[in-house]
A protein has these predicted regions:
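N-terminal secretion targeting segments of exported proteins
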Residues: 1-58, 184
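Catalytic cysteine-centered active-site loop
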Residues: 53, 73-125, 135-136, 177-178
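Short, low-complexity, Pro/Ser/Thr/Gly-rich segments in the mature regions of secreted, periplasmic
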Residues: 175-184
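...with weaker cross-activation on analogous glycine-rich loops/strands in unrelated enzymes
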Residues: 2-8, 14-16, 35, 102-162
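Catalytic alpha/beta core of large soluble enzyme barrels
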Residues: 161-171
Length: 184
């Protein structure tokens, strides 16, 4: 098929498709009945998501996506905030949030005091999640911070895996979960 014939055929198909969709829209075919599409103002306001939460959710997704670029980056306790060659848990969260204009304190304990409390059941992507784990843990003190990545997963760094994604609802992370904070 030569280029001219191909182009003519493509234009004909495109024009026919456009005319067909226009006819469907003009007749109302493929749309919901008026009664089904009518929604009271009260129902809309009760179920609506505020612009702030949509923006925060979008920023949370951006924070997590940016953090995923560092998967496998090694862990070092007390890591300097001036390098991305290695992180500890709180320098990692501090670094990835700073890219999106959120200035977090340096330590996981200090980070656990900013923002507002949020239940585990109401976590949104980008929320900070805190644990009492490791040799310094007593079950009540914050020793670790992660970022909620959605679908029951956390993005964080610790030990030999370095920056990694873990399941919040199993193993050590389920047992040592303390609380969560929303900073977006």
């Amino acid at each position: 098929m030569n280029k001219q014939h191909w182009f003519k055929q493509a234009m004909t198909i495109g024009l026919c498709t456009t005319i067909g969709f226009s006819a469907l829209l003009a007749t109302g075919a493929g749309t919901a009945p008026a009664a089904a599409s009518a929604v009271s103002a009260d129902a809309v306001s009760a179920d609506s998501v505020s612009a702030d939460s949509v923006s925060a959710s979008s920023t949370g997704s951006k924070v997590v996506s940016f953090g995923k670029k560092y998967l496998g980056t090694r862990y070092q306790f007390g890591a300097s905030t001036s390098t991305t060659r290695y992180f500890d848990c709180s320098s990692f969260t501090q670094y990835i949030f700073k890219k999106y204009g959120v200035d977090l304190p340096r330590t996981s304990v200090a980070q656990s005091k900013v923002g507002k409390s949020v239940s585990k059941a109401n976590l949104r992507v980008g929320d900070l999640v805190f644990f009492s784990s490791g040799s310094r843990a007593n079950g009540k003190n914050v020793t670790h911070v992660a970022v909620y990545a959605g679908n029951g997963k956390i993005l964080h760094t610790y030990g030999s895996p370095g920056v990694t994604i873990s399941d919040l609802n199993s193993g050590n992370w389920k047992k040592t979960y303390l609380k969560s904070r929303r900073v977006l």
